[in-house]
């Protein structure tokens, strides 16, 4: 039964956004209270769906008055528990989920400036379609493009397959609009390419995971649309062979768009899931490397030249045909889907780590990760972004995920790497932040957060332990 204060809170929220957009029934809230992995979940009093930056500000001010926490959420495709409420515990404040899925306005593409303004609920696919309609393209892409949104991609500083060429989401944000914990609207959507007037809101909020302000819109950079593409799937004898291939590609292929890595376990899993045999295969395969090139003319000649001279290749397939390329890319894009299906079969949510190390340490990382998985008795399925030394380590049927994390993340830190390359910290990796950040660094980050949100209202427990 709701208290009088809770009833009043719901009434005020309903006045702010409309009663139809304040979801209080258990069955309506359920999908917003659990994340995509199924591993992280927590209860909320209500899900509130504002339709404008003014409504976002009003909701935040109401939450402040009633001393409830607020969890910003859009596509809810996060993998580290940062987009859902924290588990219920004695004495904890109640939570409101703010769903930004109604903020879907997309401005006219400015083809001269190569920019567009998008609200936080616009999906990456919609962003890309808008750019394509104007003869341009988007610089960030990843498999969850149909549901992942602009707001979430900025909040986590998302990466994806095109980081090699264009950088992470932070580099694409040339203007931002957000609402602070005081309900104040800050930032600018002007998109000036040169501006040095004080602190840069886009840089501050990218990667802040909803802890400093709620992102409501952004002015985004666009890039040329290279309509001639070539994709190669290459089987190599060793991780060292893959790294040498990467170096050769970087030196010689000016159209290089992405260089991905797929472990044989991941290739077998996705192959079984989609019902297609791998396009390349050999008993000698230690690793698969997927290469994407894109240009204004056929980029395959440079790519073929490098592949013909590279050592350690045991098999390869290359295509410029759109249908065949889509088939090749499916072996990368549907890995996460295949992992989720396999985890459903064993009845245990996938335990995921997203790490990066210097390229010369990748071999050591893979050995440590496999050893930790073997000790646990679970199935390790690695894939990722070779150019950035970024591996997604997926554990199917893990019995003791914390032990795996301790082993792997400690090794990552000792190898000079990071415990989060693109998925963010969320709540999942907070206990290991001290591996890569010294106390002064953590104190400074906490001070920034306290200055903007002294009541710890916005996404408490994310990036820092709750209450710090």
Predicted region positions:
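Activity-critical C-terminal alpha-helical subdomain
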Residues: 184, 430-468
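C-terminal substrate-recognition/cap domain of FAD-linked oxidoreductases
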Residues: 24-32, 224, 230-235, 241-403, ...
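Residue-level signal for inorganic ion chemistry
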Residues: 13, 63, 121, 183, ...
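N-terminal accessory segments
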Residues: 1-36, 66-68, 310-327, 414-419, ...
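Conserved, mostly hydrophobic/aromatic
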Residues: 63, 210, 453
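N-terminal flexible segment immediately upstream of the FAD-binding catalytic core
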Residues: 1-61, 78-114, 143, 266-277, ...
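FAD-binding subdomain of flavoenzyme oxidoreductases
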Residues: 105-260, 457-458
């Amino acid at each position: 039964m709701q208290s009088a204060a809770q009833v009043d809170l719901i009434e005020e929220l309903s006045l702010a956004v409309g009663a139809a957009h304040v979801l209080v029934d258990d069955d309506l809230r359920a999908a917003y209270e659990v994340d995509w992995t199924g591993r992280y979940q927590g209860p909320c009093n209500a899900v509130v769906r504002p339709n404008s930056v003014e409504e976002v500000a009003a909701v935040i001010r109401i939450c402040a008055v009633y001393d409830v926490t607020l969890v910003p959420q859009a596509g809810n495709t996060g993998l580290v528990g940062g987009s859902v409420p924290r588990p219920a515990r004695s004495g904890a404040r109640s939570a409101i989920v703010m769903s930004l899925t109604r903020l879907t306005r997309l401005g006219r593409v400015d083809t001269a400036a190569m920019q567009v303004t998008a609200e936080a609920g616009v999906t990456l696919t919609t962003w890309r379609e808008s750019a394509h309609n104007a003869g341009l393209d988007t610089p960030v892409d990843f498999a969850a493009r149909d549901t992942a949104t602009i707001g979430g991609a900025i909040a986590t500083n998302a990466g994806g397959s095109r980081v090699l060429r264009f950088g992470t989401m932070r580099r694409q944000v040339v203007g931002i609009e957000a609402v602070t914990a005081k309900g104040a609207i800050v930032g600018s959507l002007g998109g000036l390419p040169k501006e040095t007037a004080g602190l840069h809101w886009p840089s501050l909020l990218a990667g802040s995971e909803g802890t400093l302000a709620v992102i409501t819109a952004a002015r985004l950079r666009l890039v040329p649309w290279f309509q001639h593409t070539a994709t190669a799937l290459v089987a190599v004898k060793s991780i060292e062979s893959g790294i040498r291939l990467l170096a050769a590609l970087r030196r010689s292929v000016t159209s290089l768009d992405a260089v991905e890595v797929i472990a044989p376990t991941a290739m077998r899993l996705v192959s079984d899931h989609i019902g297609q045999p791998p396009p390349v295969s050999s008993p000698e395969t230690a690793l698969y490397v997927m290469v994407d090139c894109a240009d204004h003319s056929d980029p395959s000649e440079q790519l073929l030249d490098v592949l013909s001279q590279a050592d350690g290749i045991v098999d390869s397939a290359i295509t410029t045909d759109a249908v065949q390329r889509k088939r090749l890319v499916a072996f990368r894009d549907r890995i996460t889907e295949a992992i989720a299906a396999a985890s459903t079969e064993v009845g245990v949510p996938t335990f995921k780590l997203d790490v990066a190390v210097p390229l010369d340490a990748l071999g050591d990382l893979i050995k440590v990760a496999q050893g930790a998985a073997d000790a646990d008795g679970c199935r390790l399925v690695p894939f990722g972004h070779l150019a950035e030394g970024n591996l997604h380590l997926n554990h199917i049927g893990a019995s003791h995920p914390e032990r795996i994390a301790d082993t792997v993340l400690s090794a990552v830190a000792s190898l000079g790497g990071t415990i989060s390359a693109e998925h963010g910290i969320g709540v999942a990796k907070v206990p290991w932040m001290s591996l890569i950040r010294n106390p002064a660094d953590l104190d400074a980050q906490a001070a920034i957060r306290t200055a903007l949100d002294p009541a710890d209202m916005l996404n408490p427990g994310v990036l820092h332990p709750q209450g710090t």
